[in-house]
A protein has these predicted regions:
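Alpha-helical membrane-protein topology signature
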Residues: 1-182
Length: 182
């Protein structure tokens, strides 16, 4: 389940990359750089806690690819949510360094990840066509596999897959289900 989740996470980036290159999706370089950074923080903290999973590995790899593509094809924005995400990541790093507690870094990174998703929620609500429904559906399926792959239900192991599941569930409702109801 763990490997399947990671593979699906990576595969989901393919239609998203295609949508970016075909100018169907306009990613924010700032948002994707933040997501890539906080996902990297989560990966490092989860590795320290021996809680690493395939989904976060796929997420970090894909997020950095999208961050680079966003520099070429994206539209830079820097709003309050981006600043909250940066602050959350910085707090996580400082807490981890000061206390040696990687779980605090995981918690802060997931708060920052969720805060960073809010502009995407708003965009998905206002204009669902700007997001790739195939990518979001595959990411959601990856989340289901990641949840089943959790071996130990504690913050170190479960918070990241749960956060990703909430984000992807909201996006599937907004860009896959809701447009069919309108």
């Amino acid at each position: 389940m763990n490997a399947v989740s990671g593979i699906l996470m990576l595969v989901a980036f393919l239609p998203y990359v295609r949508a970016i290159v075909n100018h169907q999706t306009v990613p924010s370089p700032v948002t994707w750089a933040i997501w890539a950074s906080v996902d990297t923080l989560a990966l490092l903290a989860m590795k320290k806690e021996k809680a690493l999973n395939g989904q976060i590995i796929g997420a970090v790899t894909g997020a950095w690819i999208i961050a680079v593509l966003a520099l070429v094809f994206g539209k830079p924005t820097m709003g309050s949510i981006e600043w909250v995400s940066i602050a959350g990541a910085m707090v996580g790093i400082v807490l981890w360094q000061r206390t040696g507690n990687a779980v605090l870094a995981i918690i802060c990174s997931q708060i920052a990840t969720f805060a960073g998703a809010i502009p995407t929620f708003v965009g998905g609500y206002q204009n669902p066509a700007q997001e790739d429904p195939v990518a979001w559906t595959i990411w959601f399926i990856s989340c289901i596999f990641a949840l089943f792959a959790i071996k130990k239900w504690n913050l170190a192991n479960a918070l990241q897959p749960l956060t990703f599941t909430v984000i992807n569930t909201v996006m599937v409702v907004l860009v896959v289900i809701r447009p069919h109801l309108l």
